[in-house]
Amino acid sequence: MEENNYVIFKKQYGNIKRPRVKELSINLNGVKIYEKEQSMIINIIVPVEDSTKTIQYFEEFNLGEDIQFNIAGTGDFECSFRGISPVIDKNSYSSFSITVQEKEPQDQMKG
């Protein structure tokens, strides 16, 4: 898998002693990101055979839970999960959107 062709979503779980990360990679061609005032809408299109595992991955997030994503190896965006839209199934693909809110960098929050 060529990292530069994918968006990698990351979910942290476990505890401080045993932190774990669950990742999901989606081809860049199937991801479109739109910025709104205080959030981002991420439209996702995946082949129908990948839709179940992809949707299940995002359904595991709770409202406000941390989510990270890395676009083509450019570094992690730290966000809070805000929700998932209904899924639209077509013949060969499924599409849906997730909403995330970018987190404030720690040093900006203090000052």
Language-model segments: residues:
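Short beta-strand and beta-hairpin "edge-sheet" elements
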Residues: 18-19, 66-110
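Oligomerization/assembly interface segments of phage tail-like spikes and tubes
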Residues: 28, 32-52, 91-107
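Short intrinsically disordered terminal tails
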Residues: 1, 110-111
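Short coil-to-beta transition motif at edge beta-strands of beta-rich domains
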Residues: 58-68
